[in-house]
């Protein structure tokens, strides 16, 4: 869509039409002391000057080897991703309300949705959400709408920022949140769910791998949840689905999660995208846009926005959400990422992440002053290590050696004093892991 700003002749004509001489007269009703002062902006720069200016700013950043995750992860992004999403046809998140005019954009959304459905084993995906936290909160709202109940059970293993977002969404509602505490093994035991879920429970929200990296027994938990006629919301790291059972296989009703691991850079925490997939019975209650495939009157394949009567531009305050397509560019990155890896490549990538994390785990827990918090548990990317050493000292020594160390879990939960959350992805080499363990041994 072309955008050409007004020239001086256009501006003069508009001012004459509304009967004023200068744009500043539009603001006469605003007291002068409340008006913005003149902005201290220098004159224009040449391309070379601009490049040098931002290069100087960027040079102040310190590049570190990362062993920290906790929601945002250092994964390799194939060059294919940037090549595709950087095309002018895609370089915007916005889908116009005359959406059928943008067939390429709609097809890319449709392909993304198809891949998310294949990955999760569920029937319908939306066009994406803002991030994992909002996707989780929207899943809770969906469950409340669909069930007509007002009690939500949430695992303590849910990312704490996701939990806070859910609480914010429900702050002025009548919904009740009950926290399911993790066991000493770092998981939610099915007996704990069985004791807490009742006829008033709208949904049970379980994250796997959970915030501590531990993989939950989702099939066993699903059996308990389904026996009580409650909805099961699975919060996932999509990369883990390369090796672990899909939500569709263990009969989850809703699957959500953070899509950053699928081709989006860390970017200091965002922007990324969230994904959501649901069983067919819930698709009318699902938030966000949905692209569908159809044929025109001549039998040609085409794409449309479907089930639009759920949305804000039609339902207004009765809409399922105010989510539109503002995260679609990042979702497109996820689509390209998944397509590029393919089934076998994606599985192999997940296996490499498991292998490298296990290698680091075995090295670290063998050091004096370090031990596993959750022994003999399957984990993905992340693991918790308990230490008798000074954590602040460890972090500072690692920083001096160019390493962003693990997360100090005491800042998240006081029950995890002296505990560190390590993260190891496919980006980390054995040499880097060995260097990490050498520094920890000397700390």
Swiss-Prot record:
Pfam families: GDC-P (PF02347). It catalyses: N(6)-[(R)-lipoyl]-L-lysyl-[glycine-cleavage complex H protein] + glycine + H(+) = N(6)-[(R)-S(8)-aminomethyldihydrolipoyl]-L-lysyl-[glycine-cleavage complex H protein] + CO2. Its EC number is 1.4.4.2. It is an enzyme of class 1 (oxidoreductase). Gene3D superfamilies: Aspartate Aminotransferase, domain 1, Type I PLP-dependent aspartate aminotransferase-like (Major domain). InterPro entries: GcvPA, GDC-P_N, GDC_P, PyrdxlP-dep_Trfase, PyrdxlP-dep_Trfase_major, PyrdxlP-dep_Trfase_small. The keyword Oxidoreductase applies. Keywords: Oxidoreductase. One of its GO terms (molecular function) is glycine dehydrogenase (decarboxylating) activity. The keyword Oxidoreductase applies. NCBIfam families: PRK00451.1. The glycine cleavage system is composed of four proteins: P, T, L and H. In this organism, the P 'protein' is a heterodimer of two subunits. This is Probable glycine dehydrogenase (decarboxylating) subunit 1. The gene is gcvPA.
């Amino acid at each position: 869509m072309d955008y050409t700003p007004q020239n001086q002749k256009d501006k003069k004509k508009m001012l004459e039409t509304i009967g004023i001489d200068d744009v500043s007269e539009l603001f006469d009703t605003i007291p002068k002391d409340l008006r913005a002062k003149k902005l201290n902006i220098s004159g224009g720069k040449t391309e070379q000057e601009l490049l040098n200016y931002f290069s100087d700013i960027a040079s102040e950043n310190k590049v570190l080897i990362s062993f920290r995750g906790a929601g945002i992860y250092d994964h390799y992004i194939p060059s294919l991703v940037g090549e595709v999403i950087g095309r002018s046809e895609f370089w915007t998140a916005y889908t116009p309300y005359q959406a059928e005019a943008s067939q390429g954009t709609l097809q890319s959304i449709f392909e993304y949705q198809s891949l998310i459905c294949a990955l999760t084993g569920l029937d319908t995906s939306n066009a994406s959400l803002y991030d994992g936290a909002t996707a989780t909160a929207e899943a809770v709202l969906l469950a409340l709408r669909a069930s007509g109940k007002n009690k939500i059970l949430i695992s303590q293993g849910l990312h704490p920022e996701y939990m806070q977002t859910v609480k914010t969404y429900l702050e002025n509602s009548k919904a009740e949140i009950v926290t399911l505490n993790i066991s000493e093994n770092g998981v939610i035991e099915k007996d704990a769910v069985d004791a807490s879920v009742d006829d008033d429970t709208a949904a049970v929200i379980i994250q796997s791998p959970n915030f501590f990296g531990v993989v939950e027994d989702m099939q066993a938990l699903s059996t308990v949840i389904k026996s009580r006629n409650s909805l099961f919301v699975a919060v996932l790291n999509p990369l883990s689905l390369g090796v672990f059972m899909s939500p569709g296989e263990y009969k989850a009703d809703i699957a959500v999660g953070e899509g950053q691991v699928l081709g989006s850079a860390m970017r200091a925490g965002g922007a990324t995208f969230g994904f959501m997939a649901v069983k067919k019975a819930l698709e009318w209650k699902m938030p966000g846009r949905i692209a569908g495939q159809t044929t025109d009157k001549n039998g040609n394949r085409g794409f449309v926005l479907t089930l639009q009567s759920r949305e804000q531009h039609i339902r207004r305050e009765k809409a399922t959400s105010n989510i539109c397509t503002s995260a679609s560019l990042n979702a497109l990155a996820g689509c390209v990422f998944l397509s590029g890896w393919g089934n076998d490549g994606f599985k192999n990538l997940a296996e490499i992440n498991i292998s490298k994390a296990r290698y680091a785990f075995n090295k670290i827990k063998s050091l004096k002053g370090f031990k596993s918090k959750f022994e003999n548990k399957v984990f993905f990317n992340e693991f918790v290590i308990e230490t008798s050493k000074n954590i602040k000292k460890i972090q500072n020594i690692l920083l001096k050696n160019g390493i962003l160390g693990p997360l100090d879990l005491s800042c998240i939960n006081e029950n995890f004093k002296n505990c560190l959350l390590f993260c190891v992805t496919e980006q980390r080499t054995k040499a880097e892991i060995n260097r990490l363990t050498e520094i920890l041994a000397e700390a």
